[in-house]
Amino acid sequence: MQKFTFFVSCAKGIELLLKDELERLGISSQEKLAGVEFEGSIKDAYKVCIYSYLASQVMLKVATDKVINQQDLYEFISSINWMDYFAVDKTFKIIISGKHYDFNNTMFVSQKTKDAIVDQFRNVINQRPNIDTENPDNVIKLHLHKQFVNVFLCLNIDSLHKRSYRQFQGQAPLKESLAAAILIKAGWLEELKKHQPILIDPMCGSGTILIEAALMAKNIAPVLLNKEFKIFNSKFHNQELWDNLLEIAKNSQKVTNAIICGFDIDNNVLDKAQRNIYQAGVEDVVTVKRQDIRDLENEFESEGLIVTNPPYGERLYGDQLDELLDIFNGFGDRLSQDFYGWKVAVLTSFADSIKEMQLRTTERNKFYNGAIETILYQFKINEHAKFKHETQLEKNIRIAEASAQKSDEHIDFANKLKKNLKSLKPWLKQTGLECYRLYDADIPTFAVAVDVYSEHIFLQEYRADATIDQNIAKQRFYQAIYQIHKTLDIKYENIHTRVRQRQKGKEQYQKENDKNKFHIINEFDAKFYVNFDDYLDTGIFLDHRKIRQLVAKAAKNKTLLNLFSYTCTASVHAALKGAKTTSVDMSNTYLEWGKNNFTLNNIDAKKHSFIQADCISWLKTNKDKFDVIFLDPPTFSNSKRMDDILDIQRDHELLINLAMDSLKKDGILYFSNNYRRFKMSPQILEKFNCENIDKICLSRDFLSNKNIHNCWEIKYK
């Protein structure tokens, strides 16, 4: 039987797997870049076309030569006796791959090749074969490399990776040949030797991995699924041999007891997978159902293999990146808890997702899904697989340290911290303050507020604009954590973080966490409990420092009504100056916190009033009069404890009028709010003596944010 040289192409990264596959077919080959080469018969080449799960193209090598100009190219192509390869009545097309030093235009190479072939036929028999780019009888491929041109005749007209079963696919489809490659690399062929092989794809998408696994389990030759497969129509083609080999392949299929299961959280994707499974004819082996990967359970009697190709991070998830990472964290937990003894393989281009699994890899291999470089991470689930449990603090430190290596942007942030601290030092020394704002989005790219509480930092991230890449914003936030630790010499565990955004309803009063860890801070002659972790705010508003002093001074040895009193810090300052205070707030939690603040300052809380109530409703029924009132409402609130929604711009006139009804004629109302676009009601300005005291209430550490609050002193005329 006549021997030829064949080149079998494949995706980069699977050459060795393809070489092994050909060995199983009885064909010895040599590994090349993006393929293998072997000496063999047409029958050998047909077997590759029929049985290979990994090959893309099987090509008969025609000729190779060095070519340095267009005339060389024409003469080289003309030197090949094309009439030995196909008849004049057979159509052909030309495809070009690779790069040549002297030819930048592949269209030119294709045209010159076509001219040489057509001219040869015309010169010899006065007829010419026709070009057909859609459905040719033969495909001639030229691969360019440096100054060499390699000419091949393709046995398969379309790529072998096309199986025809995939009529429905998701956003990032995995090539069938690559799915087969990762299954083989992960050990599916060895698994098939077991009494009952088991394979799970917990993020199965449109089902490609499941179907390829089933084809191998049932020994279905891939070419049998390709309804549009077309073998070349060359003079070397042997139709009888081809038909006989196809018949052998059909008769080689077998029944399997393999268990192949797929899961996905998306019902639409599962519907596509189910239709593809039926199209491939493997519905007797493959089952799919809806399930979150974080709820994956081991319902099997023996160990098996888990292979999956999850969505590629930012490419599909975008600003849902945190959700993706959480999914992988949960996946890693399920594997270590419930799949002891199993082997796992995950193909992804997104390394951060693998880190979240917190499992030790046993092997890593590079593959390409088209142009996308991916890594196949393999794991063996045993007592050595799981990394030590990573606490949230350890995770934050790891991400912060890694983020600092990704760019140098944070250097400017560090320099700004140093500059601000140097500027504030004389004032801090003069006042004796240990709690202050050090930084407030001074650099637009680092939109955070840094509040110093002695040896602790409260780091607040302002919600990034929708136009800002959420992943970049997250990276900068962690870079800020890194620089606070490094520049200010603050322990990582003393850096407490929060994202600032509008709170709705009961969220304003709900706990963020449940650590119940309180710290004591000093403000002038008062002490306060603060909590950095459990609530949205710490328990004290640093920007209200000056207005607390004004209120306390005005209320000395008098009566004070503190409305929306929060943790009663203003009441404490006033009580220390001899005031009798009444604090009103909707939250019993904060009122209890306020009582503890009184006790901390050796003030008998029983001699003061703490009232849990909606301030508006309470004011409407209050009959007492006060010397000083401090009214500091939120900008917006729709708590279920309130009779109505509070909107400070809309409702401040009502609030002030009600508060003034509880004020003595010679008393003072201090009104404050944080709504940046606040406009005082003309009716209030007309009715009372109103003085804006924003500048008086602005502390040295808040000068860069002059609109942080609106403060008014209001008296009767």
UniProtKB/Swiss-Prot annotation:
GO terms for molecular function: 23S rRNA (guanine(2445)-N(2))-methyltransferase activity; RNA binding; rRNA (guanine-N7-)-methyltransferase activity. Gene3D superfamilies: 3.30.2130.30, RNA methyltransferase domain (HRMD) like, Vaccinia Virus protein VP39. It is found in: Cytoplasm. The lineage of its organism: Bacteria, Pseudomonadati, Pseudomonadota, Gammaproteobacteria, Thiotrichales. Its main location: cytoplasm. PANTHER family: RIBOSOMAL RNA LARGE SUBUNIT METHYLTRANSFERASE K/L, RIBOSOMAL RNA LARGE SUBUNIT METHYLTRANSFERASE K_L. It catalyses: guanosine(2445) in 23S rRNA + S-adenosyl-L-methionine = N(2)-methylguanosine(2445) in 23S rRNA + S-adenosyl-L-homocysteine + H(+); guanosine(2069) in 23S rRNA + S-adenosyl-L-methionine = N(2)-methylguanosine(2069) in 23S rRNA + S-adenosyl-L-homocysteine + H(+). Its EC number is 2.1.1.173, 2.1.1.264. This is Ribosomal RNA large subunit methyltransferase K/L. Coiled coil: none annotated. Keywords: Cytoplasm, Methyltransferase, RNA-binding, rRNA processing, S-adenosyl-L-methionine, Transferase. Residues 44-155 form the THUMP domain. Belongs to the methyltransferase superfamily. RlmKL family. Specifically methylates the guanine in position 2445 (m2G2445) and the guanine in position 2069 (m7G2069) of 23S rRNA. It is an enzyme of class 2 (transferase). It holds the Pfam family RlmL_1st. The keyword Lipoprotein does not apply. NCBIfam families: PRK11783.1. It comes from Francisella tularensis subsp. holarctica (strain LVS). GO terms for cellular component: cytoplasm. It comes from the Bacteria.
